[in-house]
From Swiss-Prot:
Belongs to the bacterial ribosomal protein bS21 family. Pfam families: Ribosomal_S21 (PF01165). This is Small ribosomal subunit protein bS21. Residues 50-59 have a biased composition (Basic residues). The lineage of its organism: Bacteria, Pseudomonadati, Pseudomonadota, Alphaproteobacteria, Sphingomonadales. GO terms for biological process: translation. It comes from Erythrobacter litoralis (strain HTCC2594). One of its GO terms (molecular function) is structural constituent of ribosome. Residues 37-49 have a biased composition (Basic and acidic residues).
Length: 68
């Protein structure tokens, strides 16, 4: 990954770098890899996230259709 520093403005270049890293998901991956996660824990975490997403989508659909 490469960021150009223009007019010796390091602060702006750092902000651009952080934004790129955030968009690429590097921070999220670093957080996940900080400690070892057992495969069973990973499956449980991913399943819980899927359930949350499904509930959220269902709520959005119900709200959109006017059913409450």
């Amino acid at each position: 990954m490469q960021i150009m520093v223009r007019d010796n403005n390091v602060d702006q270049a750092l902000r651009a770098l952080k934004k790129k890293l955030q968009r690429e998901g590097v921070y999220r991956e670093m957080k996940l890899r900080r400690h070892y996660e057992k495969p069973s824990e990973k499956r449980a975490r991913e399943k819980a996230a899927a359930v949350r997403r499904a509930r959220k989508m269902e709520r959005k659909r119900m709200e959109r259709d006017g059913i409450k």
